[in-house]
């Protein structure tokens, strides 16, 4: 008879096979009421799952991440049930869990409208209130295909036909609705009470543009209404911070149909972009990197030798000239190897760090483009380190220190780290992989950093570490990476003369801290809601005169700051000073320097910040010193 071991180490003995729900009931009525699913020997299963042998068991509630995932999966089924109830001719396809929610794709004779979305959500609440039991059953493969065909659900039948023979076909039913699913699911629809449908979008069946366009309904679901309300509030704040809106409002950039996925930088936006580039250029210079520049258009033959043509040719922009095929480079690494290959290299030359603000282009699908976050033309703070196997750990350690310093300077303190190790298909010996993985792991552990292991998620050419920023809305952005490459230097003929006089192939470390500069501008803009710290602000201060009598003095003050290297302008328009203050505050200018007759006489300015606070009178020299200190410290106030 089964003995159940709980997470706290305690044991429960039963004299007969039991379900997970019965285990929960044996522990207490509160847990039985709260339980949604459970893990049996690590596998997530329904509460109806029978335990017939000794097992380790953990009950899952809405407070657990697993519980929220089960809720979202079950809410996707609830959505499909509501759609079928309201629109019987609609066909259901797939409905997975995604970050913060779920979606379900439907085939229907007409587009769903916002009014339809409201009706569907209302129907979902109605079905949830009925607390319909959710029941699992299995069915033979051919019988399941025939069952869904009899319902007119051709997509479901096609999905089952693609499932390998021998796999269990499980169905879940609630009320008069049945869906194909592995599960697990909540025990009844009454557990689903914190959800909202978000939007409708198009999606091709199986993600193939040659197939039918389906209608995708997105939704979100949470463990309780409080979490749902908090999420919706975060969405509202994210909407307010949307870099596309702020880009227009602050006159930073625009994009247009004639160049999809390409950025038209305006003067203010280009200042911001250049400040980031110049900062990273100093980082390169101060940390032993040599900056290079490589061609934008390179012959197909190089991409074939590097292996990129075989894997990425669909994502390349190509052209031809004089009977030769060319590609606009989608990445910089093969070109960096060409620079390395010029001249004989010795072990004394290593590590060799080559950096480039490399302009790259990738032919992303138009539907995937999203402002600055997903573009076709972008610039990377790209660098490649050529080193020996013995130097990997030290170079990775140096890079990690540098990355955290850079992120801190931009105002990011929370960084998530993932280490990805060898996949099944890979190049290089196990011995070399052992060394590389050990070097990355040791470098992380030596700094006391928390990190997650992703077994098998490394590239075919080597293991990697990924670094993701967490912004003020707790969103995670993967920006930094360092990847070990055993393949490309060999493919492209890179060698060095070792201490023994023989030629060896160097290891190549691909590394970036910010990634795409365009994307990083988008991240910064949303993180700060356009209120950039002084050192990054396109306009750092505006001098405002109250009347025409102070115009000449206002010009002199602005020029004094400009001569010290600050981006300061004078607004001498014949407008009320209150109007000018509001306008420049809305433009997120960090400092407003107001001058009236009193300030002219004293040789000072009255200082206001964009948050509306009055900081009193400052002499010009004192304020220049304040700006200098704040810029040097890269303070993130205001």
UniProtKB/Swiss-Prot annotation:
Gene Ontology biological process terms in this record: threonyl-tRNA aminoacylation
Main location per the UniProt record: cytoplasm
Residues holding Zn(2+): 333, 384, 510
Source taxon at top rank: Bacteria
Domain TGS: 1-61
Keywords: Aminoacyl-tRNA synthetase, ATP-binding, Cytoplasm, Ligase, Metal-binding, Nucleotide-binding, Protein biosynthesis, RNA-binding, tRNA-binding, Zinc
Catalyses which reaction(s): tRNA(Thr) + L-threonine + ATP = L-threonyl-tRNA(Thr) + AMP + diphosphate + H(+)
Region feature (Catalytic): 242-533
Subcellular location field: Cytoplasm
Cofactor dependency: Zn(2+)
InterPro entries assigned: aa-tRNA-synt_IIb, aa-tRNA-synth_II, aa-tRNA-synth_II/BPL/LPL, Anticodon-bd, Anticodon-bd_dom_sf, Beta-grasp_dom_sf, TGS, TGS-like
Pfam families: HGTP_anticodon, TGS, tRNA-synt_2b, tRNA_SAD
GO MF term list: ATP binding; metal ion binding; threonine-tRNA ligase activity; tRNA binding
GO cellular component, one term: cytosol
EC number: 6.1.1.3
Cofactor binding mode and count: Binds 1 zinc ion per subunit.
HAMAP family noted in UniProt: Thr_tRNA_synth
Quaternary structure, from the entry: Homodimer.
Record family assignment: Belongs to the class-II aminoacyl-tRNA synthetase family.
Function recorded in the entry: Catalyzes the attachment of threonine to tRNA(Thr) in a two-step reaction: L-threonine is first activated by ATP to form Thr-AMP and then transferred to the acceptor end of tRNA(Thr). Also edits incorrectly charged L-seryl-tRNA(Thr).
Protein name: Threonine--tRNA ligase
Species whose genome carries this gene: Methylococcus capsulatus (strain ATCC 33009 / NCIMB 11132 / Bath)
């Amino acid at each position: 008879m089964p003995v159940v071991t709980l997470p706290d180490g305690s044991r429960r003995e039963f004299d007969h096979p039991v379900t997970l729900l019965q285990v929960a009931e044996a522990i207490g009525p509160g847990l039985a009421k709260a339980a949604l699913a459970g893990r049996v020997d690590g596998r997530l299963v329904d509460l109806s799952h029978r335990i017939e042998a000794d097992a380790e068991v953990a009950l899952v509630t809405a407070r657990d991440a697993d519980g929220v995932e089960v809720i979202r999966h079950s809410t996707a089924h609830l959505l499909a049930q509501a759609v079928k109830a309201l629109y019987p001719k609609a066909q259901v396809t797939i409905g997975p869990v995604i970050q913060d929610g779920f979606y379900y794709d439907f085939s229907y004779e007409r587009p769903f409208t916002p009014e339809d979305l409201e009706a569907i959500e209302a129907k979902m609440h109605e079905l949830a209130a009925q607390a319909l039991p959710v029941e699992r059953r299995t069915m033979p493969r051919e019988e399941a295909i025939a069952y869904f065909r009899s319902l007119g659900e051709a997509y479901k039948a096609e999905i089952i036909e693609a499932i390998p023979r021998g796999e269990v076909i499980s169905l879940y039913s609630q009320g008069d609705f049945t869906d194909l699913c592995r599960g697990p699911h909540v025990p009844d629809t009454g557990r689903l009470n914190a959800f909202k449908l978000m939007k409708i979008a198009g999606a091709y069946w199986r993600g193939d543009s040659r197939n039918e366009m389906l209608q995708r309904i997105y939704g979100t679901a949470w463990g309780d209404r409080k979490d749902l309300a908090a999420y919706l509030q975060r969405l509202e704040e994210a909407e307010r911070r949307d870099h596309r809106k702020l880009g227009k409002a602050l006159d930073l950039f625009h994009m247009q149909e004639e160049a999809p996925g390409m950025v038209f930088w305006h003067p203010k936006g280009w200042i911001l972009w250049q400040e980031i580039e110049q900062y990273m250029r100093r980082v390169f210079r101060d940390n032993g990197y040599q900056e290079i520049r490589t061609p934008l258009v390179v012959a197909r033959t190089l991409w074939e030798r590097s292996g990129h043509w075989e894997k990425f040719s669909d994502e390349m922009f190509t052209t031809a000239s004089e009977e030769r095929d060319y590609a606009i480079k989608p990445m910089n690494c093969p070109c960096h190897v060409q620079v390395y290959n010029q001249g004989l290299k010795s072990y004394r030359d290593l590590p060799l760090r080559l950096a480039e603000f490399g302009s790259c282009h990738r032919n992303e699908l138009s539907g995937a483009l999203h402002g600055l976050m997903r573009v076709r033309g972008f610039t990377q703070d790209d660098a490649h380190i050529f080193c020996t196997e013995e130097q990997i750990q030290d170079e990775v350690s140096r890079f990690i220190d540098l990355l955290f310093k850079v992120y801190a300077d931009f105002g990011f303190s929370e960084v998530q780290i993932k280490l990805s190790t060898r996949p099944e298909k890979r190049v290089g010996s196990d011995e070399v992989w052992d060394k590389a993985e050990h070097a990355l792991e040791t470098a992380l552990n030596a700094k006391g950093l928390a990190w997650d292991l992703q077994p098998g998620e490394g590239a075919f050419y080597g293991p990697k570490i990924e670094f993701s920023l967490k912004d003020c809305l707790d969103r995670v952005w993967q920006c930094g990476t360092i990847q070990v490459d055993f393949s490309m230097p060999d493919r492209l003929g890179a060698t060095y003369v070792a201490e023994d006089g023989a030629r060896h192939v160097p290891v190549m470390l691909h590394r970036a801290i910010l990634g795409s500069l365009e994307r990083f501008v988008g991240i910064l803009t949303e993180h700060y809601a356009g209120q950039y710290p002084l050192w990054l602000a396109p306009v750092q201060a505006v001098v405002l005169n109250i009347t025409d009598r102070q115009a000449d003095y206002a010009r002199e003050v602005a020029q004094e700051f400009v001569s010290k290297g600050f981006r300061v302008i004078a607004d001498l328009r014949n407008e009320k000073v209150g109007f000018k203050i509001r306008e420049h505050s809305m433009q997120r200018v960090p400092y407003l320097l107001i001058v009236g007759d009193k300030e002219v006489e004293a040789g000072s300015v009255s200082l206001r910040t964009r948050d509306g606070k009055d900081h009193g009178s400052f002499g010009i020299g004192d304020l220049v010193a304040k700006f200098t200190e704040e810029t040097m410290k890269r303070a993130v106030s205001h």
